[in-house]
Amino acid sequence: MKRMIALDGAQGEGGGQILRSALSLSMITGQPFTITGIRAGRAKPGLLRQHLTAVKAAAEICRATVEGAELGSQRLVFRPGTVRGGDYRFAIGSAGSCTLVLQTVLPALWFADGPSRVEVSGGTDNPSAPPADFIRRVLEPLLAKIGVHQQTTLLRHGFYPAGGGVVATEVSPVASFNSLQLGERGNIVQMRGEVLLAGVPRHVAEREIATLAGSFSLHEQNIHNLPRDQGPGNTVSLEVESENITERFFVVGEKRVSAEVVAAQLVKEVKRYLASPAAVGEYLADQLVLPMALAGTGEFTVAHPSCHLLTNIAVVERFLPVRFGLIETDGVTRVSIE
């Protein structure tokens, strides 16, 4: 019998990432875990619908036995079984992030006995989670270099707080993992601005694009009007394609916040990324830790290692026989498998 791993949910950033990473790793390694103080660092601690959906999805995919899987629970015991490929559908029942649920279960399906399709309904444009286009255009091309073949499709947008969005991913078992080397970003090839609108006046998008164009030379400017019943909602994104990597940044519009202020937030974030020669942005860095650990080799550079990143590394090191090294030089941190 494999040993039970005990995790403190208040560790590091004290959010849901600890739980999501633990679920992924438990499914992959077969190691059971118990976690207490779930989301202790949040205003509403314990399991929300999004986290509960991730737990139930993980349990279904590997036939796990679970204790504490209920809304508001701050303690969970997860004993995994065998991961099975198949066609899965999960509903969050709120505007909780579809992509974070997918992020939890897809790594385990890399080790399944056959191809899988996972469909999740809930929120697709959430201010605290990566949108589907980030997964599709940024993360998945990098995963392909590592040897992971999955394809995400956004079937319907769902903005906060209404939700109602649908995201699906098709994934195949991984034959072998390759080393990912992302030390240098390289020169910028082009930048693309994009705005999504659903039930929001078009002039909002035009003002957001104008704000982006006032700070960057945009090779493309796209405005997409979605059906009104998928809103109301507004997301503005800026994609930076460089020689070695494509990064994508986004801000979700809010009520009573002007288009100019929303776009200015995005401008600030992109300028912070471009001010450093590091290849990887803060959000992407979190998502590369697990696949890199499974490969057992690789490295990337990031300007500032976030609390999210450090917490994720700590959880991975509890489940897998790997150690990460972080070396800071001239304001750039190189993250690698030692």
Swiss-Prot record:
ATP binds at Q103, Y283, L284, A285, D286, Q287. Catalyzes the conversion of 3'-phosphate to a 2',3'-cyclic phosphodiester at the end of RNA. The mechanism of action of the enzyme occurs in 3 steps: (A) adenylation of the enzyme by ATP; (B) transfer of adenylate to an RNA-N3'P to produce RNA-N3'PP5'A; (C) and attack of the adjacent 2'-hydroxyl on the 3'-phosphorus in the diester linkage to produce the cyclic end product. The biological role of this enzyme is unknown but it is likely to function in some aspects of cellular RNA processing. It catalyses: a 3'-end 3'-phospho-ribonucleotide-RNA + ATP = a 3'-end 2',3'-cyclophospho-ribonucleotide-RNA + AMP + diphosphate. Its EC number is 6.5.1.4. NCBIfam families: PRK04204.1-2 (NF003246), PRK04204.1-3 (NF003247), RNA_3prim_cycl (TIGR03399). Its main location: cytoplasm. HAMAP family: RTC. This is RNA 3'-terminal phosphate cyclase. Keywords: ATP-binding, Cytoplasm, Ligase, Nucleotide-binding. It comes from Escherichia coli O1:K1 / APEC. PANTHER family: RNA 3' TERMINAL PHOSPHATE CYCLASE, RNA 3'-TERMINAL PHOSPHATE CYCLASE. PROSITE patterns: RTC. It is an enzyme of class 6 (ligase).
